[in-house]
Amino acid sequence: MENYTKSTTMCGKRKPTFEIYRESDFSKITNQGTVTAFDIISNKETFSESKQLKKAKSRNVTLVDKNTKADKRYKSEKLSDYLLNQEHHKNSPKIINDVLVIGKSDGLINSFPLSQNYISSSESQTSSGNVDIIGNDNSHASPYLPKFELKSQSQSNHSNVVKNQPIKLCKKTEGGTNLDHNKSINGAVKSGTSKSANKDRIYVFYEDEEVMEYRYIFGSRMQTKNHDINANNKRKIFYQNSFSNFHLLHKIIQPNYEPASAEERKLCIEILDEVLQY
């Protein structure tokens, strides 16, 4: 996990702790095996590197920022700032489309659509509707399991595939019905004709084992989580508000979403800060 949480310094400027990949390289990432929580995927170029820095790097020239001090500690650019900064990153992806779980244990790889709701099997929480337990037994299942709303199939956007198989891509029609479940992302990118092969997609990956250890999905990446009082309080709050948080998170990532009130806007910011913190 240390490889993903530590930033590397280059030419006096820190790189982001998360990496950006193009969707065409999606198959390489899924087979990599060690992808920790909240690693963001879209294209391989880290956006903290400017064109001037790239040219200097190719010429083996070290650039020093005139406005920086030797003792100044640099911070990585936040993903939220990166998504909102359209002037400097016109071609950057703007929407987080999906959250996926890469599980190390034998069983299924679970695709967590943000439009679904989740409950904790370890805390024996109950909720209205059917709960589909994924995996051969509860030990291989994530503590947050998708609740499939059978009455609203048009809103479902989940895809469960066997490990080491390509992640399946659901292509939506105008009516919202999911089609072509057998078309993999890799195949859609190669064909170049599929509408679902969107180059501006961002995929957020986290490990199933990490979720089981932290007991909640979206949280700060603190190494001393089990000994931190604030982290324990956040964990309890997330247990109580998991339904509303996931529902609101799904609304936040919509491009035309506007908060209905100041309280909702404040909650949106808190959730985004929690999800995008690294």
Swiss-Prot record:
Domain of life: Eukaryota
The keyword Amino-acid biosynthesis appears for this protein: no
Gene null: resulting phenotype: Causes severe chromosome missegregation without greatly affecting sporulation itself. Reduces recombination by 16- to 76-fold.
Stimuli inducing this protein: Induced by transcription factor mei4.
Gene Ontology cellular component terms for the protein in this record: cytosol; nucleus
Gene Ontology biological process terms, A to Z: meiotic DNA double-strand break formation involved in reciprocal meiotic recombination
Record keywords: Meiosis
Function: Required for the formation of meiotic double-strand breaks and for the segregation of homologous centromeres during meiosis I. Interacts with the SFT and DSBC complexes, two subcomplexes involved in the formation of meiotic double-strand breaks. Stabilizes the SFT subcomplex on DSB sites and recruits the DSBC subcomplex onto DSB sites.
Subunit field text: Interacts with rec15; the interaction is direct. Interacts with the DSBC complex component rec14.
Protein known as: Mei4-dependent protein 2
Gene (name only): mde2
